[in-house]
């Protein structure tokens, strides 16, 4: 647990590497025809899970002095995927592992075995792979075959990314979304990273929102990269942007890409719409001014931003709305319920209507104990809520932050905040 007071952070902080970008770059490097070096200033439990799993699939992966050296190796007779609690690792690597190994053991921890893998498993079964059971831990048998893949687009975009990353190993493949593709920016991040490593993906976008297709041509192969830079992470930069908006004290985040395709870059517009100023100086972004206008956000394309936006909403007088959050029920926790409970526990007012959430902010919370339900993004939200709390906030399961941002509390204190283990 951690206890967080309302001491205000301000100043300049370096961005941490984008987890979504790092996962994809590491996988491309492990599948390449030559070694790669990837610049990664920090790691996390989720990134470690991907590196461990790539080792289990035959790659030689060494992380030293903020550089990952990836040397592709022959796939073992039996592969081993160890995603721990990382849904991204699991979903991206299931088809990748099946594209290079005849047999693969797959483990999982925490809530991960209960997170959805359909319709991807069904498509893999239709293309040559069998599973000992329908949720991990399980063993996959049979090599994934290329061809036509079709899936709904409203469960997880990671299914599309995983099949795209596997495609160069299995020949000509087309992956089609039979319903509108949600979190499509993450698929764009996948195709851009694949292009960086030498594989061009053909993207066909019809006039309607369905039958969006991605094709990887026959003969495509990944090539290694030297000193490949992982860009700054927007989902974690959002913590600092929201902190600035809640307190009115400026915070600058260095090493960010204004033109990133990361879905959570949308937090910039959220801050502007809430009345803050967002200014750029090269790759540094600064947020100034206290947020004053209620938030009205569609969660379909940025579901991971709900927890920190909920904290921001608590600091703004009036009703903020967060709609279309169905997929948040399938995260590390049921995030709609968990966020609502956290707001209530700390003295805020919130209303749930189906998959929508409405927060009636007053600018002040009482504080007290909040349950982060072993969800790293709830830890971020609870820490932010302490900024407007009358008494300290005690966060249960605060160690969950190591999933994505192990040094978070150290950085928080570095900028003048006060978070202490209890």
Model-identified regions with their sequence ranges:
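Short, structured segments at the rim of ligand-binding sites
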Residues: 1-422
